[in-house]
C-alpha cells in the first residue's frame, strides 16, 4: 500500500517521468476486500461494512481521477486457466470460474467502476499460446464482462503479444 504515495512523490519531483499524467495499473482481488477496507460480502455483518464500501469507492475514484488504472486480478486469486496436468482442461471447475468472475463484478467492480483490464492470477491464462477463439467460453465470458486487455504475470516465459480484433493479450 506504500506504492501509491512513493510513486506520487517521485512524479512530483520528476514530472517528466509520467507521460500525460499516467501512473500505474493496480489490480484488485476481492476476497478480503479492497484498499484495506473490509468490502467483501463475508464482512457484511461488520458494523462498518457500508461505510467501508463507501470509503473504498471514494479512494478508488480518487486514484482514477489522478491517472491510476484499475484492473481485475479475479475475486479469489484462483488458477483461472489451463491445467498443465495431462488429461485436465482447466485448473478450476467452470462453476468456480463463473462464480469468481461474478463475485468480482458484484464486490469489486461495483466499487471501483468498470475496467477493461484483466490480469491473470498466477499467470494462469484461459488458453495456451494460440490466439483466443470463439470456442473458448472462458475468454468469451470475460470478454462479455467488458475485459479487453488480458495480461499475464508469468515472468518465467519470454514476453509476447497477441492482438485480436477487439482485444489485446500479453
Cite the ranges covered by each PLM segment.
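Active-site beta->alpha N-cap acidic-glycine motif
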Residues: 1-62, 66, 126
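Glutamate identity and glutamate-enriched acidic tracts
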Residues: 8, 12-13, 32, 50, ...
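Loop/turn elements at helix/coil->beta-strand transitions in domains of secreted/extracellular proteins
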Residues: 14-25, 64-71, 110-117, 145-150
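A mature extracytoplasmic/lumenal domain signature
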Residues: 30, 74-76, 122
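Surface-exposed cleft-lining segments at the edges of enzyme active sites
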Residues: 35-49, 77-93
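Polysaccharide-binding and catalytic clefts of secreted carbohydrate-active enzymes
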Residues: 59, 71, 78-82
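C-terminal active-site subregion of NodB/CE4 polysaccharide deacetylases
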Residues: 81-170
Amino acid at each position: 500500500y506504500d506504492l501509491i504515495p512513493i510513486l506520487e512523490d517521485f512524479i512530483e519531483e520528476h514530472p517528466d517521468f509520467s507521460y500525460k499524467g499516467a501512473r500505474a495499473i493496480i489490480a484488485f482481488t476481492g476476497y478480503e476486500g479492497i484498499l484495506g477496507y473490509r468490502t467483501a460480502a463475508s464482512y457484511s455483518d461488520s458494523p462498518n461494512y457500508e461505510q467501508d464500501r463507501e470509503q473504498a469507492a471514494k479512494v478508488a475514484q480518487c486514484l482514477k481521477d489522478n491517472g491510476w488504472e484499475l484492473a481485475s486480478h479475479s475475486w479469489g486469486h484462483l488458477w483461472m486457466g489451463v491445467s498443465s496436468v495431462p488429461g485436465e482442461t482447466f485448473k478450476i471447475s467452470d462453476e468456480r470460474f463463473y462464480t469468481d468472475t461474478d463475485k468480482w463484478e458484484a464486490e469489486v467492480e461495483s466499487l471501483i467502476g468498470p475496467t477493461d483490464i484483466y490480469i491473470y492470477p498466477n499467470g494462469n491464462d484461459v488458453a495456451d499460446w494460440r490466439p483466443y477463439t470463439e470456442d473458448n467460453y472462458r475468454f468469451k465470458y470475460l470478454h462479455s464482462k467488458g475485459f479487453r486487455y488480458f495480461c499475464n504475470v508469468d515472468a518465467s516465459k519470454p514476453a509476447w503479444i497477441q492482438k485480436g480484433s477487439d482485444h489485446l493479450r500479453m
